[in-house]
Amino acid sequence: MNTQRSIRTCVVGAILFAAVATACNKEDDKAVKGRTGPNGAARDTVSDLALNEDGLGQIQIGMTLDEAVNMGLLNERPDIKQACDFVFPAVGAGIPFGVNVMVVKGKVARIDVDTGTVTTEDGAKIGDSEDKIKSIYGDELKVSPHKYIEGGHYLTVMGDSASAGKAMVFETDGKQVTMFRAGRIPEVEWVEGCG
């Protein structure tokens, strides 16, 4: 009898947890209250999160970690290494799991994406074929061999941002995009992250 009651309690708890989690996710899809972009414009929805060479949503390459923490975008990291470390988006910032932010000497240097829910502002995403990336970026793309994946590539978009010292890099397995990132040169080109 106690076993049945325990099972029933667990099932009811799981259903309630799922309902709360679903409601929270729906809230994340709505406006992020009180948040503004670097130019002062309000950020309306999570759909505004498209990666480009300058950043992802309100997280901008070159902003300080303190600015991002104070805006509620990134988690505070009192233990952060001064040279280089990764920081995760703050819960409630509307940034999906799978986005990691590299901070070098206290400033956002690069943003890594390994989730299919984030695209570039040109619509490129994880799972896209190399040919699709080449068709989107054309002559702006530089192709180089992947350091660790046989047959894989780094597809680097320099474009106009190269003069500003920024780029975007797509990693592939030779067929499709497995992850991508944007940020300052040289950090965006570091294969091992901070390693």
Question: What are the residue ranges of the model-derived segments?
Answer:
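Post-signal-peptide N-terminal segment of Sec-exported extracytoplasmic proteins
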Residues: D44, L49-E76
